[in-house]
Amino acid sequence: MEAARILVVGAGLAGLALARSLRQAGFAPELIERADRWDIAGTGMYLPANGVRALRALGLQDAVAARASDIPRQRVLDHRGRVLVDADMHQFWGGIGPCLALPRSELHQLLREGVPVRMGRTVRSLERPDGPVGVTFDDGSGAEFDLVVGADGLRSTVRRLAVDRRPPIPVGQQSWRFLAARPAEVTTWTVLLGRGTSFLSIPVGPGLVYCYADVTTGRAGGAAPNGDPVGQLRRRFAGFAAPVPGLLEQLDDPAKVHVAPIEQVAEERWGRGAVLLAGDAAHGMSPNMAQGGSLAFEDALVLAACLRDAGTISDAVAAFVARRSPRTAWVRAQTHRRDRTRNLPPFLRDLVLRSFGQRIFRSHYRPLLDPV
């Protein structure tokens, strides 16, 4: 199996992790990326300890930790700053590892070190998905591969060509993301909840804080709003307690705010024959469990192990899907449960979180304590 011809499409977090894991297992995958240069969004990444555990297996935990903030607690407040939930991350995750947060660009840089990537190339068509897969690239050239893995994100070309033509669907939330200078009071993961709104701030290394804000729009509200995102944020989150006013006051350039609807894949699908999906291409979902990167890193480790241990590509693919599907389906279900809780009337939501927030947190994350 080490001689298997493997194409990985997409050099985001999922594709880079997969290429790295495959190389560790003795394979020589070809990794291609549509973009002709790196242009990583100026946002942040929060990695719960199961994701950090996966990075440890990829040989990157120490390098990531050196650039990241350790996140000791998750605090949920109402919009006036009153505590609803205060969960101890070190106590919950125990020896599995720390929870870390850092700029997305720095995590991407660490993942791509030592991993060859062919830039400015993508897939135009896929033939014989049962294998060997005939691939035509966007420059008209072609090649055959024993396995093609689409790790090309929520709007995956590989998914559209071979697995599921349906586009992602909105979950009913609009998001704004940006980085800001870190005020002294931002020491850990902290979210403030309003009526149909939330504002999250996370330290992401020395001097920086990652801010994520969203508003519930309803299922039809998939399009990004027009206009000035800075003004939108200031209007939507007027009246929120610290640190929100100070963070919004820092914003002086609308181009630094990344605005997008929150979307998920129409249905969790893993592939067709020797065309496989990984990361968001397979199971993209709402970010409210902060598991997008972590699940992608776990996918990378499990797929490499299945290919190493199986006798055939089809056996490896079947083993991979059997191991990953229950875990990713669980996380997807929890994102829906969390959305239902946050969309309760504020007085009822706050009562539920004050009374049962710790129990809810543990129930949502407990299965992720188990190794992959």
Regions found by a protein language model. Name each.
Residues F27, L60, A242:
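Short phosphate-binding/catalytic loops that engage adenosine nucleotides
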Residues S156, S175-R177, T197-L200, A282-H283:
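Histidine-centered metal-chelating micro-motifs
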Residues E2-A4, A66, G246, M289-A290, ...:
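C-terminal helical "tail/cap" subdomain of flavin- and related membrane-associated enzymes
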Residues V117, G131-V133, L192-L193, A238, ...:
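Short gly/ser/thr-rich secondary-structure transition/capping motifs
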Residues V8-A35, V149-G150, W176, L233, ...:
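Conserved mid-domain beta->alpha element of the FAD-binding
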Residues W189-G221, F237-F240:
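Active-site substrate-recognition segment that forms the wall
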Residues M1-I6, P48-L179, G218-R234, E263, ...:
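Conserved N-terminal helical subregion
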Residues A223-K256:
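Flavin-binding catalytic cores
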